[in-house]
Design a protein with these regions (language model features):
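Cell-envelope and extracellular/periplasmic
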Residues: 11-259
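Bacterial Sec-dependent signal peptides at the C-terminal "C-region" and cleavage site
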Residues: 3-13
């Protein structure tokens, strides 16, 4: 009876969120001095040992597929997690597993694995095979679900697929990805899937964002988060720190309001 009580208590301890996608989920917002030393209140990261640890930037540090640690920055996960903790009063566990420069096809179940590069990846990983994005998302999410209920799958990706020659078929690929992910995690449609638009000043945003906005026609229990009014770094690809913070609040508000 005692073991059962401890197990149940552990499973109810955290609200768990799977945070996946490409560079804007990994984070490219520039840090403020306190970001990398001050833990977020009530927010935890699933570490490389599968344990919850206090969340300190960069939040994508424990991703098993990430690019080099120096490339990681502030993402929407920062304010999203803070907001969800403030609204619920419960501890939030982020399962961060994003990688910059990745296409939707590279996230599909069974997609061919690629290799780490020799530029922006950690030197100790150069030319090694990168673990399957899909398999690692499932594996790490399951590890996180040992500590609480999976509350949402939080996604930001699309820049790599926004070119006119790549945009066709994106929604059907995303639909398959979400269906497989929910199935393999054993959660079905009860767990929301949340996706946000790319930087509004990006040259491909006028075509990509309206397409993604119709996500509800493709994926049950899914929400689109508008990026309108948000600003980017000088590269016009990545959201700046201030906009990442606002974006995360929009994600949290949408999830809390169910729309």
């Amino acid at each position: 009876m005692l073991l059962l009580t401890v197990a149940c208590s552990r499973q109810e301890e955290y609200d768990v969120y799977l945070m996946i996608g490409q560079s804007n989920m990994a984070g490219r917002g520039f840090f403020e001095p306190t970001d990398t030393v001050t833990a977020l209140n009530g927010v935890y990261l699933l570490d490389s040992e599968g344990l919850p640890v206090p969340a300190v930037e960069p939040l994508n540090r424990y991703s098993t597929i990430r690019k080099g640690l120096p490339t990681q920055g502030v993402s929407l996960a920062h304010s999203f997690a803070e907001q969800m903790h403030m609204q619920s009063g419960r501890k939030v566990l982020l399962v961060m597993n994003a990688r910059g420069g990745t296409s939707i096809k590279s996230w599909l179940k069974g997609a061919p694995q690629s290799r780490y590069g020799t530029g922006s990846d950690d030197p100790q990983n150069w030319r090694k095979q990168i673990p399957s994005f899909y398999d690692e998302a499932v594996r790490r999410a399951r590890e996180g679900m040992a500590y609480g209920k999976l509350k949402a799958i939080v996604w930001h990706q699309g820049e790599s697929d926004s070119d006119p020659g790549k945009i066709d078929g994106y929604m059907s690929d995303l639909q398959k990805f979400v269906f497989d992910l929910r199935t393999d995690l054993g959660v079905g449609e009860d767990v929301p899937f949340i996706a946000g638009g790319i930087l509004p000043t990006h040259q491909n945003a006028p075509a990509f964002n309206p397409m993604l906005e119709k996500i509800g026609d493709w994926i049950p229990n899914s929400y689109f988060i508008s990026s309108e009014g948000l600003a980017g770094n000088p590269d016009n690809l990545h959201f700046n720190r201030e906009s990442q913070i606002e974006f995360g609040r929009r994600y949290a508000s949408s999830l809390s309001n169910g729309k």
